[in-house]
């Protein structure tokens, strides 16, 4: 009989401004060292700048940006007969959103603007127009998936 306690997933509350789970999750990815209030300020500032520049609803903008970046497949490696194959696997919506948010946050830190707020604004605007490093990362993943389509029937 197992003595381990059952693991319950932590519930992430919706963000206070838009009431959205997706935005609350995005703020959690931006957060560093537990400073959620600072992460919220950074995110809301960048969203307000983007909505002013593009003259659109900020919530719809975020959904479009995440849709542009999120992948449909993921690559898992499997060793069969002494060689390692990269097998493309279809992923669910939550996992693809996780990848898109992580890529946006990671690639915004690599940009050359001053301050993280401006870096995030630049990355989000470029992601809206499909010109960002995050969308390039998605395209590279899609190329690898196309090369390894023959192995998609393998089971993991």
UniProtKB/Swiss-Prot annotation:
GO terms for cellular component: small ribosomal subunit. It holds the Pfam family Ribosomal_S7. One of its GO terms (biological process) is translation. InterPro entries: Ribosomal_uS7, Ribosomal_uS7_bac/org-type, Ribosomal_uS7_CS, Ribosomal_uS7_dom, Ribosomal_uS7_dom_sf. The keyword rRNA-binding applies. Gene3D superfamilies: Ribosomal protein S7 domain. Keywords: Ribonucleoprotein, Ribosomal protein, RNA-binding, rRNA-binding, tRNA-binding. The keyword Ribonucleoprotein applies. One of its GO terms (molecular function) is rRNA binding. Part of the 30S ribosomal subunit. Contacts proteins S9 and S11. Belongs to the universal ribosomal protein uS7 family. One of the primary rRNA binding proteins, it binds directly to 16S rRNA where it nucleates assembly of the head domain of the 30S subunit. Is located at the subunit interface close to the decoding center, probably blocks exit of the E-site tRNA. This is Small ribosomal subunit protein uS7. The gene is rpsG.
């Amino acid at each position: 009989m197992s003595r381990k306690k059952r693991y319950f997933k932590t519930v992430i509350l919706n963000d206070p401004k838009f009431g959205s789970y997706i935005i609350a999750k995005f703020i959690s990815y931006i957060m560093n060292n537990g400073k959620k209030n600072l992460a919220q300020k950074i995110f809301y500032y960048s969203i307000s700048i983007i909505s002013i520049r593009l003259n659109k609803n900020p919530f719809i903008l975020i959904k479009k940006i995440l849709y542009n970046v999120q992948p449909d497949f993921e690559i898992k490696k499997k060793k069969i007969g002494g060689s390692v194959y990269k097998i493309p696997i279809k992923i669910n919506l939550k996992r693809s959103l996780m990848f898109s948010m992580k890529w946006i946050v990671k690639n915004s830190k690599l940009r050359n603007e001053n301050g993280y707020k401006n870096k995030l604004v630049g990355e989000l605007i470029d992601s809206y127009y499909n010109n960002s490093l995050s969308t390039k990362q998605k395209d590279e993943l899609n190329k690898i998936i196309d090369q390894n389509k023959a192995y998609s029937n393998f089971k993991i």
